[in-house]
Design a protein with these regions (language model features):
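Interdomain motor-coupling "hinge/lid" segment immediately C-terminal to the ATP-binding subdomain
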Residues: 1-106
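Accessory nucleic acid-recognition modules appended to NTPase machines
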Residues: 60-179
Length: 179
């Protein structure tokens, strides 16, 4: 199909300071912050860790922001990954993304992901797992970072750690998770 040309620009979710500015909360000039101001900042930070930094969801209640972020995730999976890279096995892609987002801060190996897919009776080759993870990173949904080591061999041999582009996406795809 013919499509028009597009200019791409990378827009990332708000940082905590940007969320505070968006919500009209002034960042204190002196640290440490004490008293009521400290309590307010802690509450805002807890909310930021739950909701994330996508600007549109900042004003929503939990049920609505969760559904909105789930929709963002689904659109990114279908358009930015599956359609763009002609991935036919969307079930495997959904499983991989949810598994990676549920493993934030943990080590994730392609072998373990492949075994999990096989256990779920989702037919996918190990090379497809590698390529789908690369596409997920390309779409800025999650990042798999190597172990910090001076040895290149050690970096390559160890499983990578998973990180999400936004905290809210993690909460949106993990029902019942409070942290």
């Amino acid at each position: 199909s013919l499509r028009g040309r597009a200019l791409t620009s990378e827009l990332f979710p708000f940082s905590f300071a940007e969320v505070l500015a968006h919500r009209g909360i002034e960042v204190p000039g002196q640290w440490p912050v004490v008293g009521v101001e400290r309590s307010r900042l802690q509450n805002e930070f807890t909310r930021y860790l739950s909701v994330g930094g996508f600007p549109e969801v900042q004003r929503f209640e939990e049920d609505f922001w969760r559904r909105t972020l789930q929709s963002y995730l689904e659109i990114a999976l279908l358009r930015d990954v599956a359609e763009r890279h002609a991935i036919g096995n969307v079930q495997a892609l959904r499983f991989l993304v949810r598994r990676v987002l549920r493993s934030i801060g943990s080590r994730v190996s392609v072998n373990a992901l492949h075994k999990d897919l096989q256990a779920q009776r989702i037919a996918v080759g190990k090379d497809q797992v590698y390529s789908q993870l690369a596409h997920v990173e390309d779409a800025f949904l999650a990042f798999l970072l190597p172990l910090h080591a001076n040895s290149e061999r050690r970096r390559q041999m160890n499983p990578r750690k998973a990180y999400a582009i936004d905290h809210g996406l993690v909460r949106a795809c993990t029902p019942g998770r409070d942290s």
